[in-house]
Amino acid sequence: MDIVGGQNLRQMWDDLAGVYGDKTALIFESCEGIVRQFSYASLNEEINRTANLFYSLGIRKGDRVALHLDNCPEFIFCWFGLAKIGAIMVPINARLLGEESAWILQNSQVSLLVTSAQFYPMYREIRQDNSTPLNHICLIGEQLPADDGVSHFTQLQSRQSTTLCYTPALSTDDTAEILFTSGTTSRPKGVVITHYNLRFAGYYSAWQIALRDDDVYMTVMPAFHIDCQCTAAMPAFSAGSTFVLLEKYSARAFWDQVRKYQATVTECIPMMIRTLMVQPAAPTDRQHHLREVMFYLNLSEQEKDDFTERFGVRLLTSYGMTETIVGIIGDRPGDKRRWPSIGRVGFSYEAEIRDDQNRPLPAGEIGEICIKGIPGKTIFKEYYMQPEATARALEPEGWLHTGDSGYQDEDGYFYFVDRRCNMIKRGGENVSCVELENIISAHPKIQDIVVVGIKDAIRDEAIKAFIVLNEGETLSEAEFFSFCENNMAKFKVPSFMEIRTDLPRNCSGKIIKKNLK
């Protein structure tokens, strides 16, 4: 089913500006509460100015430009400005340090970077090391340095025409972005995303949440992440909705912001749900316009019930990854939900559970979740410059091996068990970290929990739990292990526990387990 019809991102924005004109497209709120607002017409003009800025700096079709930015309107300008001239965006996780950022610059062969003043000292050192092709930095902000090879984004952009001066031929098969995966267990891989991928994501995700042009989609997810781009921004713009982008997440401010912008749709990760739940209850908890909350794994049933009861919202489960572009398995508005199912496969996709020999498994049996799509259209095109990794993950017929364990029931509902790399092998038994985390998170004193496997000379791996307690609480080892013994099989009970003040996370809230082992 071709729902894109040959429309690239340049044509998309020209059409949106013509159709929606003065309607509000983007609202941005900074951490200081400063609000910037753009109509569809004015946002398209800013995108065109930015495209011309890149052209003035020598960027042409096929060139790669890195963005290292926190959430800001300039990210949107650059993302689509590059797409309009056929150039390729390489977003860099704003939490990465120098060595990791330099590795991405080197592996994507980026010569131009757009970043903000706070990150400039790190990139000045990277340039001085001459370890990457980076030769020019375009800075966003005020009181910027006048160093060689540095230009000021706002000054350059404001001088540009709102009419594109460079319009190379574009195809929906052209690469629009190389998005490096989070790399929680190893070096990240560059996921190649096309114009078609992004256009499809807009239509698909808008369908998934029944988005309309009178909706307001608010997100705090980082703009450099696939969730913000393909589950929030693209569907909001594709539907002619208003997209509200917040600079940073604040549990204290979240519901006030939902009410302020009259948001009807938002997205949450487990960390957000847990921190929202520890905020003091208020009479206004249910006073909002939210009809759907897009939700990403993992959450216990008790946490889900407590959240929906307190705030009067529905959690719309969505399962996917960078390589699938969108949530290819999920719930749908109005459909009956079958918790803890992650939902059913969406249109344009197929899904199977496969065994270790790549054979389909019947309902009820646990195996690897495999997804069939069209590379470069409904799933990613390839890993950038990594043909062997691409071949391991993606079969010629379009079957993607997710590396996740799960099963399906007789009615076609899928159930997530764990990341395959998250399974602990303990004395001949496979133990799911997610299962243990869901059980332990029910302890009333525990705010956050992660379980990892550590080497054990006798049983292959031992189980260790890292715990963050609710404010003011204490928890003895005896109390912890007693709780575990009463709620899980003996072979699943952790051997060790460690209380910490926080847990290391990547940009999407996923815990970086390699930092704990």
From Swiss-Prot:
It comes from the Bacteria. This is Crotonobetaine/carnitine--CoA ligase. Disulfide bonds: none annotated. Keywords: Ligase. Its EC number is 6.2.1.48. Pfam families: AMP-binding, AMP-binding_C. Signal peptide: none annotated. It comes from Salmonella agona (strain SL483). The keyword Iron-sulfur does not apply. Catalyzes the transfer of CoA to carnitine, generating the initial carnitinyl-CoA needed for the CaiB reaction cycle. Also has activity toward crotonobetaine and gamma-butyrobetaine. GO terms for molecular function: carnitine-CoA ligase activity; crotonobetaine-CoA ligase activity; medium-chain fatty acid-CoA ligase activity.
